């Protein structure tokens, strides 16, 4: 009488390895896109917060411009990093930003691993809450629905 061996054959093991590899090849790119999309909220949150701060300055001092003396104007300085550091918030003209006494355009420029988010690229907002992006994706995809 033959005794039956316990365990898996090499073919069974290789079948499992192939299935795991196929699942990983589908899941990893989807996960990376999810992480980029989730990190985008860092830019949106920071842009909205800073736009609100500039609006409060405008309400109080009738100007969006920076002044180190709080009694003479707004003290919100740029550039600065977003809360989690995935973006640098700028008003620099080289990235499409602007800040004058009567208007502003804040631009969130991706930093570090977030630069791979080429679909949305730079996100921006201005004094009338007009939102924009520099990538190829739609505005709704980048800023939310």
Give residue ranges: language-model regions:
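Membrane-proximal N-terminal amphipathic helix
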Residues: 36-63
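N-terminal single-pass transmembrane signal-anchor helix
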Residues: 2-34
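Residues at secondary-structure transition points
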Residues: 5, 37-41, 45, 99, ...
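Glutamine-centric residue-chemistry signal
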Residues: 5, 14, 54-55, 114
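Periplasmic/extracellular, small/polar-rich flexible segments of pilin-like filament-forming proteins
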Residues: 59-145
């Amino acid at each position: 009488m033959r005794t039956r061996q316990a365990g898996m054959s090499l073919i069974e093991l290789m079948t499992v390895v192939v299935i795991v590899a196929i699942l990983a090849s589908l899941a990893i790119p989807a996960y990376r896109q999810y992480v980029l999309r989730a990190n985008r909220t860092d830019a949106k949150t920071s842009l909205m917060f800073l736009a609100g701060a500039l609006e409060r300055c405008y309400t109080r001092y009738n100007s969006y411009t920076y002044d180190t003396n709080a009694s003479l104007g707004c003290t919100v300085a740029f550039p600065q990093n977003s809360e989690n550091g995935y973006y640098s918030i700028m008003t620099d003209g080289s990235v499409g930003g602007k800040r004058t006494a009567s208007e502003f355009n804040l631009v969130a420029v991706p930093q570090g691993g977030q630069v791979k988010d080429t679909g949305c690229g730079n996100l921006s907002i201005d004094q009338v809450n007009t939102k924009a992006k520099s990538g190829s994706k739609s505005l709704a995809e980048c800023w939310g629905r």
